[in-house]
Design a protein with these regions (language model features):
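Glycan-recognition and catalytic cores of secretory/periplasmic carbohydrate-active enzymes
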Residues: 1-236
């Protein structure tokens, strides 16, 4: 519903808010756009997160020899790319803006640490999912570039000391508390440091328990999937 219906119907931008009958409420909190839990518009970080969750769910279905919908991997790539295009460096400075409207125009320019962490995790997960499908290095180069760029950003602007990440920056990448104060969570950063070192499936906790750290390749046979090309010539 979230990815294959709502994101697809809204140009791969995921609506955040719904009525009790699951109708999108696109104007919700327009008058309070920086609400810490229910911001107005589109949150690119959630697009990145849903892209990762989609390939992880797909990995779970493969692992259990269940039917895998054809749309899953391609949709993950589309929602990842829309979030990247809308959010990354769009106001002239490094970093992801917090929110945009449904045309991709930035609304809240603050940079949240969790957004770039989800970008790091999503780029690593999609890259590995493609490799697990038997795709070549040229198909994953884009995700490797994103991964390295976002790791570099985190190191330059977010990591204060080992294990200490600044949670919010302003549009000029200076510490801010407009939305959040302090350091309310660590799990996004922890995931970002581990995702590239683990398989797409099982989950991080189970993979660590099984001793899969630094063994990211799938134990299952490669699956063929249709390449999703970018650039001047569009999709192949």
């Amino acid at each position: 519903f979230a990815v294959n219906v709502q994101a697809r119907e809204h140009g791969w931008r995921l609506p955040e808010h719904y009525s009790t009958s699951w109708e999108p409420r696109l104007d919700y909190n327009r008058d309070e756009p920086a609400h810490p839990f229910r911001p107005y518009g589109v949150t690119p970080g959630h697009g990145l997160e849903w892209a990762r969750l989609t390939v992880q769910l797909r990995g779970a279905l493969i692992n259990r020899s269940m039917s895998v919908p054809d749309w899953m991997l391609e949709a993950a790539e589309h929602i990842f790319e829309q979030a990247r295009t809308d959010g990354w460096r769009v106001d002239g400075a490094p970093g992801f803006v917090y929110t945009t409207d449904f045309d991709g125009k930035p609304v809240v320019h603050e940079r949240m640490h969790w957004v770039v962490c989800e970008g790091i995790s999503a780029s690593a997960a999609i890259r590995q999912a493609l490799l697990d499908d038997g795709r070549g290095e040229i198909d994953v180069e884009h995700y490797e570039h994103c991964y390295r760029a976002w790791i570099d950003y985190a190191e330059e602007f977010l990591i204060e000391a080992p294990g200490v990440w600044t949670h919010e920056l302003d549009r000029d990448n200076r510490p801010s508390t407009r939305t959040w104060a302090g350091h309310p969570d660590i799990y996004h950063a922890l995931q970002a440091t581990l995702m590239a070192r683990l398989p797409v499936w099982p989950t991080i906790g189970q993979a660590l328990a099984e001793g899969r750290l630094d063994e990211p390749n799938s134990l299952l046979p490669a699956r063929a999937s249709k390449p999703h090309r970018r650039g001047f010539f569009g999709r192949a």
